[in-house]
Curated annotation (Swiss-Prot):
Cellular component terms per the entry's GO annotation: cytosol; periplasmic space
One Pfam family hit: Redoxin
Subunit structure: Homodimer.
Membrane-spanning residues: none
Protein name, entry field: Thiol peroxidase
Amino acid sequence: MSQTVHFQGNPVTVANSIPQAGSKAQTFTLVAKDLSDVTLGQFAGKRKVLNIFPSIDTGVCAASVRKFNQLATEIDNTVVLCISADLPFAQSRFCGAEGLNNVITLSTFRNAEFLQAYGVAIADGPLKGLAARAVVVIDENDNVIFSQLVDEITTEPDYEAALAVLKA
C-alpha cells in the first residue's frame, strides 16, 4: 500500500505505510556516526523518538534536528534518533558545528530497507530514494505510540503532538 505526500505542493508517492499507534515497531539496523551498526534493540527499555527526514543539509530538516535536540532535554528515559540518508560524516559535521549533543544521528545508507519497513520511502519525484518526513514514537516495549507522516515534506513535524504522548 502506498501513500501520497507533497514536495513543494506536488504529489509524491511514498511506498508502504507508516507504523500506526498500537503496532509493534519493526526492528532495524542503521549506521552510527562511527560507522558501526545500530539496532532498535540497543535502546531496549527506553522510549524512542524517530525523527525521519530526507537530508540534514536542508533548512527544514536541520530545524527539526535542532528542535528535537532541545526537546530531548525535557523528556526522561527517551532517546531521539535523527534518521536520514546522509552519510554519517555529514551528520557528525552538522551536529558538531551546531553543538547538538542530545540526539543520535543514524544513516540509512547501508540499510535502505528501513525506509520500506517504516513506510517513508519516497518512490517517485525529485527526492526518489530518500525518506519522507515523519516522526514515530516508540515506547519502552517497542510498541508504536505515535506516528506522523508529514503531508508537505517542506514543513516541520508536529513537535507538540509527539511531545504530548511522551508526557502523558
